[in-house]
């Protein structure tokens, strides 16, 4: 690093994506970098056609899309197209890095981070990896050898990474969740509920819709109506019409149903119990807020990592785990019983809060700052 570069404002590339579980932490890290270094420049590198290409610009950051694709494990013969996409992505990553000249590259997982961090390693640019899950993804495991530090959210990650590189920072969460503190009455009004003694259950089916969770609710809406429990239900866009028709058939049901909840801070505040998939970011938010939770891990994820995330909580009595295969039969009855068991709710809340790591984005930026300062002194 010459004097001209060392005196310039810092530049960072953040690479990865594919799902909200990668994108929301990435944006939180970018926001924390801007708080620490107001003059810094930040460029995202993601995958063409994936969620990050919309979400990142919406958050005020520039993004470059690579033509990268993931492996098709069901149709292996079609993977020659993946190989071509990887070669094209490596070339574009090389061009992007040489033009932007970053001081550091941060990888947040997902196959889009592969070409970017590999090229950064070959050019001698320092890198840091953020692993959200309790079971490390393939891309992060491959990239970890060249990384300076690996920020993790779960203990015992030394079975995947070199212990000397691991820093236990926790997962960054959305600032409105970490720092927003709405009142319960305000939150209930947002969903059309009056202040009452009735318990509230929040069911989150994901952005597209978790079919098993949604069907578990739909099939037993009569029980929800009879219970007097208030229901906040995010169905995802693929299930909303089915859910609305089902709700209309139960006029006594106190239910707010929508495909997407814009104010999750209100939803969490209003809820006495949360039903959710076991994505890393959702779990981090629930830990931070100390929310009693039933986790229904998605079976449609790499390495079954959501089950491993959920087990990290359930084995510590910090959440209830219901396998996807048992949810239709068990979920409604378990939720309606648990939400009225105040002692069990209190115990779950206490245990899940012990796993929280607040201000995770700032902890990650602390590590980035140490690496940047070390590189400056070395050059």
Swiss-Prot record:
Which cysteines share a disulfide bond?
A: none
Q: Which residues form a coiled coil?
A: none
Q: Quick one: which pathway? A: Cell wall biogenesis; peptidoglycan biosynthesis
Q: Where in the cell is it found?
A: Cell inner membrane
Recorded topology in the membrane:
Peripheral membrane protein
- Set out the biological process GO terms recorded for this chain's protein: carbohydrate metabolic process; cell division; cell wall organization; lipid glycosylation; peptidoglycan biosynthetic process; regulation of cell shape
What does the UniProt keyword field contain?
Cell cycle, Cell division, Cell inner membrane, Cell membrane, Cell shape, Cell wall biogenesis/degradation, Glycosyltransferase, Membrane, Peptidoglycan synthesis, Transferase
Known Pfam families for this protein? Glyco_tran_28_C (PF04101), Glyco_transf_28 (PF03033)
What is the E.C. number? 2.4.1.227
Q: Which GO terms describe its molecular function?
A: UDP-N-acetyl-D-glucosamine:N-acetylmuramoyl-L-alanyl-D-glutamyl-meso-2,6-diaminopimelyl-D-alanyl-D-alanine-diphosphoundecaprenol 4-beta-N-acetylglucosaminlytransferase activity; undecaprenyldiphospho-muramoylpentapeptide beta-N-acetylglucosaminyltransferase activity
Record's GO cellular component, any one? plasma membrane
Question: Per its database record, what is this protein's job?
Answer: Cell wall formation. Catalyzes the transfer of a GlcNAc subunit on undecaprenyl-pyrophosphoryl-MurNAc-pentapeptide (lipid intermediate I) to form undecaprenyl-pyrophosphoryl-MurNAc-(pentapeptide)GlcNAc (lipid intermediate II).
Similarity field: Belongs to the glycosyltransferase 28 family. MurG subfamily.
Listed name of the protein = UDP-N-acetylglucosamine--N-acetylmuramyl-(pentapeptide) pyrophosphoryl-undecaprenol N-acetylglucosamine transferase
What gene is behind this protein? murG
């Amino acid at each position: 690093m010459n004097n001209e570069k060392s005196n310039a404002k810092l530049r960072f590339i953040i690479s990865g994506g594919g799902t909200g579980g990668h994108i929301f932490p990435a944006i939180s890290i970018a926001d924390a970098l801007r708080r620490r270094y107001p003059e810094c420049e930040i460029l995202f590198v993601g995958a063409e056609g994936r969620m990050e290409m919309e979400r990142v610009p919406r958050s005020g950051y520039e993004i470059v899309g690579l033509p990268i694709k993931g492996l098709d494990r069901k149709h292996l013969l079609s993977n020659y197209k993946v190989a071509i996409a990887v070669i094209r992505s490596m070339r574009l990553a090389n061009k992007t890095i040489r033009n932007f000249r970053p001081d550091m590259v941060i990888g947040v997982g997902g196959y889009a981070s592969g070409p970017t961090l590999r090229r950064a390693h070959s050019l001698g640019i320092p890198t840091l990896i953020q692993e959200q899950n309790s079971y490390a993804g393939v891309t992060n495991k491959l990239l970890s050898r060249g990384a300076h530090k690996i920020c993790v959210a779960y203990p015992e990650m030394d079975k995947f990474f070199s212990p000397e590189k691991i820093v236990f920072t926790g997962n960054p969460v959305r600032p409105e969740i970490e720092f927003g503190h709405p009142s319960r009455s305000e939150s209930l009004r947002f969903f059309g509920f009056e202040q009452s003694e009735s318990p509230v259950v929040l069911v989150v089916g994901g952005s597209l819709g978790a079919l098993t969770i949604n069907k578990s609710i739909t099939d037993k809406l009569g029980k929800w109506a009879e219970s007097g429990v208030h229901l906040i239900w995010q169905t995802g866009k693929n299930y909303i019409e089915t859910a609305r028709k089902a709700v209309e058939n139960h006029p006594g049901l106190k239910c707010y149903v929508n495909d997407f909840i814009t104010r999750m801070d209100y939803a969490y505040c209003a809820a006495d119990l949360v039903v959710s998939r076991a994505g890393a970011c959702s779990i981090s938010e629930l830990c931070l807020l100390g929310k009693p939770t039933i986790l229904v891990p998605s079976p449609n994820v790499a390495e079954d990592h959501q089950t491993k995330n959920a087990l990290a909580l359930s084995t510590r009595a910090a959440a209830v785990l219901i396998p996807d295969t048992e949810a239709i039969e068990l979920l409604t009855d378990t939720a309606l019983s648990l939400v009225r068991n105040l002692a069990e709710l209190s115990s779950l809340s206490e245990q899940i809060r012990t796993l929280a790591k607040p201000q995770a984005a700032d902890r990650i930026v602390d590590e980035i700052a140490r690496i940047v300062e070390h590189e400056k002194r070395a050059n």
